[in-house]
């Protein structure tokens, strides 16, 4: 099945910034959180904040182990390109489920990474205290 997608800043498609970026998010239902290089435990580009914060169903490579923070009712983990394709096609056909998971993911993201939690984490790290986010 065909998947409509845009990859900005890739293969001669200019990157988009500012309002154009947020307009593209607003016109999207799902987002792929790709990071440069090989997947690394808990590493993600800041793109995840834009995707999840704007309520998009977000797909993340399982090798990042972000499923330690988010469950399958909040983010969609994929194992490889074929798995990703199957999952995108599934959620394309299951809009209510897509919306529920995206909404739960947005809520969880804001719970984990709000300004108070981040400030406390930075202060605890700076003062040599045990620091955790989740």
Label every model-predicted segment.
Residues 124-134:
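C-terminal accessory extensions appended to soluble enzyme cores
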Residues 92-125:
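A charged, aromatic-enriched C-terminal amphipathic alpha-helix characteristic of glycosyltransferases
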Residues 81-84, 105:
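Catalytic phosphate/metal-binding cores of nucleic-acid and nucleotide-processing enzymes, i.e., regions
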Residues 1-73, 77, 129:
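Nucleotide-sugar donor-binding catalytic core of glycosyltransferases
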Residues 75-81, 91-95:
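Conserved acidic donor-binding segment of nucleotide-sugar-dependent glycosyltransferases
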